[in-house]
Amino acid sequence: MTHGLPHFTSAQVLVIGDVILDRYWHGTTSRISPEAPVPVVQVTGREDRPGGAGNVAVNVAALGAEVTLLGLIGADEAAAALRSLLAHRGVHCCLEGLPNIATLTKLRVISRHQQLIRLDFEDDFIPAHGEALLPAYSTALRGKSVVILSDYGKGTLQEPQRLIALGREVGVPILIDPKGADFSHYHGATIITPNLAEFEMVVGPCPDEASLVWKGEQLRQQLALKALLITRGEQGMTLLEQGHSPVHLPTEAREVFDVTGAGDTVISVLGAALAAGGTFKEATLLANQAAGIVVGKLGTASVTRDELQQALHPRAIRRGITSEEELLHFINLARSRGECIVMTNGCFDILHPGHVNYLAEARQLGDRLIVAVNDDASVQRLKGKNRPINSLAQRLTVLAALHDVDWVVPFSEDTPARLIERVLPDILVKGGDYTPEQIAGANAVVANGGKIIILTYQQGCSTSQIIDIIRKN
């Protein structure tokens, strides 16, 4: 695992904890209510996502691991929405539906990427509710590589000691994302992952790294943990492992957009990596990378294997000549980083300044430029039997050498419509006096929310003119 990602498909993970439905209402606001000094939000969209232990399970599944989720929900509309969302994400659910109990729900109203208000819908769980999960928990433990306890303090995990004891009996590591000011009921777990605020609530202020390490090691020993991972926001993470020196990792976040669910991502990646055979240090390195990715997303979100791979090896998105299938993979990686994909096409038989300027202008419209190129047979059908002058291999090589071109891909049809419909670029560019309706693939791009931009060709530059000059001379 030291040279890349582990084989997550071999991991068998059990998640138990507070299952939450995260709801987002997106809208616009431009005025204050006449009824009270509050903004009026015109709702334009609604979105549901699994939260809490549900988000942990979704994160594990997104990496390709097998995951089972145990938790308590109500018998309401929110419960049905949660079951559907989790099943769609590949999570095997063993959720106990409780009558007359509201499914834990957090409703956030968002405008211009800013959270205006959060509304919580919840009822108190009693110990008997949590005990109802014990038979399913004992059964689900069999064959699992790790167990993750996701504690949001909502009542599902009122007696974590029983869960820890059952896990230890069968030799399954227990990972816990803790909650509250008393960590004593997590005694005997394998590792816990408090954030800095939670950690200091238990041990007191840590003004420097030395005090954090000393107090952390004391806590690790008191709780009989094999390891303690403290997440420290912009200061990264600190891993304290029995028999090893402290490991301090700087943050990998490029831009912090939303910290919602970051702790879920940390423990899910940590758990999946340990389940796949990684060491505590290796798993922490991956969890740190994943946290850096997820805080750059809005709301409760997950991190995919491709995103992790790209974060570990940022040069993995190579430029140049590519096949269609490779191109689609590269595009997915680029989009996971929020990059805008621009696409154009043509024969590019004899590359001239008009082509170069056109491609440079197209590249300025986004972050990545794809150039789709007609193969030799296609050019001959379009331009005549004496074309192309340069073979497909020659044309691809010259285009790929341009600084503004990221990927060059050939196609064999008369138009690139099929290829464009697979790529679905954010911006489709064409040169000349076309109308959008005349451009191959334009309808599919627009239907997907993309744009069509028509650029003007440079006067006095054309392949036909160059060929005529050569013939005359």
UniProtKB/Swiss-Prot annotation:
Disulfide bonds: none annotated. Residues 1-317 are annotated as: Ribokinase. One of its GO terms (molecular function) is heptose-1-phosphate adenylyltransferase activity. Keywords: ATP-binding, Carbohydrate metabolism, Kinase, Multifunctional enzyme, Nucleotide-binding, Nucleotidyltransferase, Transferase. The keyword Phosphoprotein does not apply. ATP binds at residues 195-198. It catalyses: D-glycero-beta-D-manno-heptose 7-phosphate + ATP = D-glycero-beta-D-manno-heptose 1,7-bisphosphate + ADP + H(+); D-glycero-beta-D-manno-heptose 1-phosphate + ATP + H(+) = ADP-D-glycero-beta-D-manno-heptose + diphosphate. SUPFAM superfamilies: Nucleotidylyl transferase, Ribokinase-like. GO terms for biological process: ADP-L-glycero-beta-D-manno-heptose biosynthetic process. Its EC number is 2.7.1.167, 2.7.7.70. Transmembrane segments: none annotated. Residues 343-473 are annotated as: Cytidylyltransferase. The active site is at residue 264. Pfam families: CTP_transf_like, PfkB. One of its GO terms (cellular component) is cytosol. Pathway: Nucleotide-sugar biosynthesis; ADP-L-glycero-beta-D-manno-heptose biosynthesis; ADP-L-glycero-beta-D-manno-heptose from D-glycero-beta-D-manno-heptose 7-phosphate: step 1/4; Nucleotide-sugar biosynthesis; ADP-L-glycero-beta-D-manno-heptose biosynthesis; ADP-L-glycero-beta-D-manno-heptose from D-glycero-beta-D-manno-heptose 7-phosphate: step 3/4. It is an enzyme of class 2 (transferase). InterPro entries: Bifunc_HldE, Carboh/pur_kinase_PfkB_CS, Cyt_trans-like, PfkB_dom, RfaE_dom_I, RfaE_dom_II, Ribokinase-like, Rossmann-like_a/b/a_fold. Catalyzes the ADP transfer from ATP to D-glycero-beta-D-manno-heptose 1-phosphate, yielding ADP-D-glycero-beta-D-manno-heptose. Homodimer. HAMAP family: HldE. NCBIfam families: cyt_tran_rel, PRK11316.1, rfaE_dom_I, rfaE_dom_II. In the N-terminal section; belongs to the carbohydrate kinase PfkB family. In the C-terminal section; belongs to the cytidylyltransferase family. This is Bifunctional protein HldE. It comes from Nitrosococcus oceani (strain ATCC 19707 / BCRC 17464 / JCM 30415 / NCIMB 11848 / C-107). The lineage of its organism: Bacteria, Pseudomonadati, Pseudomonadota, Gammaproteobacteria, Chromatiales.
